[in-house]
C-alpha cells in the first residue's frame, strides 16, 4: 500500500476545540480524529532557526503532526509531486501515511511539533536516503 500512496493521501484534520474564558481543550482519540491506533507519541522542540527535521519516509508507519505551539511547514513528496502544508493551530493536524517523504521546515521561534505515530520505533521502517525512497516507490 505505501508504495502507491501519493500526496493526495496526506490530509489536514480539524480537531474539535472546546473553549471558554478559561481557555481551550482539544481531544484526540484513536480511530476517531486519528485515522489509526496511536502506539507512540513524541514531540520536537527547541529547533534552532533555519533547521529542519524529518527528511525521511516510513514503510508502514502513519503519522499525525500537530503544531502544539507556534508553527511550521511540512513538505511532502510522493516521488512525483511535492506539496507544502502549513501548520500553526493546535486544533489542526496533518495525517502523513506511509510511503510519503516528509520534511518539517520553517519552524517559528518556540514551535512545538507533536507527533502521534501508528507504530513503535523501528529503524527498519525508516527510509532515510532519498534515492532509497525513490527505489522503494518505483519497485
What would you call each of these model-derived segments?
Residues 1-94, 109-139:
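Non-catalytic, conserved peripheral segments adjacent to functional cores
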Residues 96-99:
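Short beta-strand-centered segments at strand-helix junctions
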Residues 101-108:
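Beta-rich strand-turn-strand
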Amino acid at each position: 500500500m505505501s508504495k502507491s500512496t501519493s500526496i493526495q493521501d496526506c490530509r489536514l484534520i480539524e480537531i474539535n476545540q472546546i473553549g471558554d474564558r478559561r481557555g481551550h481543550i482539544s481531544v484526540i482519540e484513536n480511530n476517531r480524529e486519528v485515522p489509526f491506533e496511536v502506539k507512540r507519541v513524541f514531540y520536537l522542540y527547541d529547533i534552532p532557526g533555519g533547521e529542519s527535521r524529518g527528511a525521511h519516509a516510513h514503510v508502514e508507519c502513519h503519522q499525525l503532526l500537530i503544531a502544539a505551539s507556534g508553527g511550521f511547514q511540512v513538505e511532502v513528496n510522493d516521488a512525483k509531486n511535492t506539496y507544502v502544508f502549513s501548520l500553526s493551530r493546535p486544533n489542526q493536524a496533518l495525517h502523513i501515511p506511509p510511503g510519503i517523504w516528509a520534511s518539517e521546515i520553517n519552524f517559528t521561534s518556540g514551535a512545538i511539533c507533536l507527533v502521534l505515530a501508528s507504530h513503535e520505533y523501528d529503524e527498519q521502517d525508516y527510509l532515510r536516503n532519498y534515492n532509497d525512497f525513490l527505489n522503494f516507490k518505483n519497485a
